[in-house]
């Protein structure tokens, strides 16, 4: 199993939308590195759900329930989606500032490549963030 972080603008697609809609496709990714990360995802991989822009916090966990397929919103046929399902809301959101303050997380893509919307995490990084949320 691999671990990931997915970023979404809460005014476009929020944690509450994800919970309400149930399993749904993660669409609209238009960056090649993010697309390649989507292609690496496997069924049952876990992803943090990150609210970008105003909140800038990890708020929940989703699970990949369907591996990549063509993004139906992409007219160029270059981009893909995966389907994800909400698993758990974090007890306490973990903010970008908290992540930046943790020396063990200084090299994660959320800090180093802040514009990337789909990024891998190491198991150790995942575990640290889970502890921070409790």
Give the ranges of each region predicted by the language model:
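Aromatic- and Lys/Arg-enriched surface recognition patch
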Residues: 60-119
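Short, charged beta-turn/beta-strand-edge "cap" motif at the junction between a beta-strand
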Residues: 50-56
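Hydrophobic beta-strand signal
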Residues: 48-49, 63
């Amino acid at each position: 199993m691999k671990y990931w972080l997915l970023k979404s603008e809460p005014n476009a697609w929020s944690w509450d939308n994800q919970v309400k809609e149930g399993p749904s496709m993660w669409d609209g990714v238009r960056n090649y590195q993010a697309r390649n990360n989507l292609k690496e995802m496997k069924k049952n991989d876990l992803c943090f759900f990150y609210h970008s822009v105003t909140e800038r916090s990890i708020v929940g966990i989703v699970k990949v329930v369907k591996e990549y397929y063509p993004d139906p919103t992409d007219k160029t046929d270059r981009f893909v989606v995966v389907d994800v399902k909400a698993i758990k809301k974090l007890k306490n959101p973990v903010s970008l500032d908290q992540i930046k303050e943790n020396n063990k997380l200084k090299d994660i893509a959320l800090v180093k490549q802040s514009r990337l919307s789909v990024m891998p995490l190491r198991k150790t990084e995942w575990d640290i963030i889970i502890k921070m949320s409790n």
